[in-house]
Structure formats: C-alpha cells, structure tokens
Regions:
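Conserved C-terminal structural/oligomerization subdomain of aldehyde/semialdehyde dehydrogenase
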Residues: 1-104
Length: 104
C-alpha cells in the first residue's frame, strides 16, 4: 500500500490490518522512512517489544502527543524532517568548550 510507505505531513492516518506481531513489524519497517510510528494496545509487554523493533525515531503509544523539544527526536532511514526539533539536536549546531582557571 503506497500511502503506508510515503512520508506524509498532514492529517493522514494509515491503519492496516495484520495477523500477528511479525507481520505488523514487517509492514511498519517496509518503508524508506521512519520518523513516527504509533502503537495502540493495552498490553505494555507487547508494546515494549514492538517499540524496540520498529525502525522509527519516535514511537507513540496510545496517544497523539507530539512531545516537546526537551525530548530527543530524530528520524530513521531517509527521514530528515524533525531531526532538528529537539534540544538534543542543538548539539549538532554547537561546540562545547570548558576553560578552567585557577586563581591564586
């Protein structure tokens, strides 16, 4: 399904039926992009296992929250948009320097 493989920025939800977790992971990871993923489940054990295996910069579980810039965020694969929208990403544009001076 082409819509599931595109990186779409807009009010689009792509919901696909699947038979088991392995098929769900295959569908989720069968794309050139990996900015966001969503899991809707009441089984937190499954959620943790799936979230580890999904190739995405952000995995939302049972919510639509975008988080805030204090949370790390970056896309996987060819996803680039959004990588610079966190405090963690600011480190790519800065260089830290420490100067220690002993004053007697």
């Amino acid at each position: 399904m082409k819509v599931a493989k595109e990186e779409i920025f807009g009010p689009v939800l792509c919901a696909i039926d699947f038979e088991n977790e392995d098929e769900a992971l295959q569908i989720a990871n069968d794309t050139n992009y990996g900015l966001n993923a969503m899991i809707w489940s009441n089984d937190l054990n499954k959620v943790h296992k799936l979230a580890k295996r999904i190739k995405s910069g952000k995995v939302l579980v049972n919510n639509l929250s975008d988080g805030d810039m204090s949370l790390p965020h970056g896309g996987f694969k060819q996803s680039g948009f959004g990588r610079d929208k966190s405090l963690e990403a600011l480190g790519q544009y800065t260089q830290s320097k420490l100067t220690l001076i002993e004053i007697k």
